[in-house]
Amino acid sequence: MSSTQGRKRSRLACETCRELKRKCDGNQPCGACVRFEYDCIYNKQTNTNKRRKTVEQDKEAPLPSPPVHVDKDARPYVTSPHHLQSLEANSGAAFFRRLALRLDPKNAPRMHTFSWNAFLGARRTSQVPVSRPVTEMLSQEGMESLSEIYFEKLDPIYGFIDRDWISRITQNRWSGLICDESEDAVLCGIAAIACLFSEVEPLPLELDLIESARFILEQNMSDTPSVTGVTGWLLRVIYLRTAETPHTAWMASSILMHMLEAAGLHCEPSEESVFQVAEEKVDSELRRRLFAVSAHLNIWISFDMGRSRTILCNSTLEMPSTREGDYTIEIMELLPYSTDLDPHKTHDAAELEASLSTVLKRVHSVPPSIMAQCNLTLCLCRRLQSMNTSFTGKTLEQILSITQRGIEAAQAIIDARAPWHQMANVPFQIICLLLAIDTRESLAQLNDAMQCLNNIATVYNTNATKEALNTASLLILMQQRRKEKCASNLSNIVKSFPILPLSETQVEAPLQQMDDMRWFNNLAGELSGFDYSDLDRFLSQSMF
């Protein structure tokens, strides 16, 4: 082969590979769709136009560049079917897309992070956000009031800030004392989250606060990270996960993890290691909480998007002590099960079933913690379903019990007007799982989940919540039509082969056989009065 020959690409790509951004070989069906059992569909009009454009461009195209040699053994798991299967199962968006393709390949909605949060970047006002000193935006009383809201609504679940420290830096800042600029980022982050968790509609103040925090944090990125700076970044990630787009939150979360590592906050201090540890004297409880909450957010943002999470070398995770009124420990205890779902790790169905059983038996106390438990359960179920595992008996009962608790937790959060990032995502993903399980028991729970999603769209009336509600309705409609088609096919067969009574004239037939014949004839007589149009409706309702 000539060394000047460029890399060959297919000029055609099927719609499935386009949606999933995969390399397509242009065959019918293509190799990727065959491997992962997708429906391989080509858009003829698009392909014709692209072929015409490609031919025109090739006339003036320069000579191809020499091929770039890549070490095939550098990351062997990238092309592994198991890795891709796990990556898709971890992502709620990819699971939704596969479910939609299974129900109706022609009309399946595009792959999108529906309901990832209630806003998806739409929490805006007509005014352009401006970065300003926190003392120009708030009075001391205003800052203290917003701090109260933060410590009431968010700190019990994500407890990583010393409340007394916030009181001290607030007092110092409004007293005119010289403060670390990163402290302003922390105050702005707390105040912005408090606004988000107390106001249904965004205020210009909220957007100015988050813009001011962003400006300070990004301006100081070249400095050696401090605990205060890392705290400011974590507050920013929490806000972005709750109100912004997935990509923005993922980028900030990745930066946060690297900041943790650079500050030496990702591992327990050790006298045996020569690696640098945190230069500041950091309370071990605070350090563990900072790392755990950061890792929790980074893992699930990455899983949701189907992207790489940030894995820190030499990181350690030790549980902090429990304290009254704090539920952060419940979130942290889920982390080992979350990290085990990394797509690079290989688990068989038995191992995942054991993890699912353990998670299902856990007791979580408050709505946000219950939704975290439910979210992990949903992911484990998706992973098992990707291995063609079915749920029956007690396991199915436990799964449906957790999903029902997840729906109730989401409703409690709506009532509290505290838009936790999983408020809309968990009910939407519950609907997807219920449709995928596809039993009478699972489908019976759909109404509660849809009502919850509708309530979210009513309170937080955004394009994101309305699109999530409409998409969930579309999925259910697709399931209904699929079942109606199956019911119609069964009905046509019954019409073609009607039930005929058995003859009872065989005198020598055993007594048991005679009883069976009478039972069958009685049943046939009862069914003979059925209108087959009624049978169509009967089958549709019982199956959906």
Swiss-Prot record:
InterPro entries assigned: Metabolite_Synth_Reg, Transcription_factor_dom_fun, Zn2-C6_fun-type_DNA-bd_sf, Zn2Cys6_DnaBD
GO biological process terms, semicolon-separated: DNA-templated transcription; response to xenobiotic stimulus
A family per Pfam: Zn_clus
Database matches in SMART domains: GAL4
GO molecular function: DNA binding; DNA-binding transcription factor activity, RNA polymerase II-specific; zinc ion binding
DNA-binding region: 14-40
Stored CDD domains: fungal_TF_MHR, GAL4
Region named Disordered: 50-71
GO cellular-component term (any): nucleus
Compartments where found: Nucleus
Keyword Transport appears in the UniProt entry: no
Disulfide feature: none
Keywords of the record: DNA-binding, Metal-binding, Nucleus, Transcription, Transcription regulation, Zinc
Function comment: May act as a transcriptional repressor of multidrug resistance genes.
Stated name of the protein: Protein RDR1
Species: Gibberella zeae (strain ATCC MYA-4620 / CBS 123657 / FGSC 9075 / NRRL 31084 / PH-1) (Wheat head blight fungus)
Gene name linked to the record: RDR1
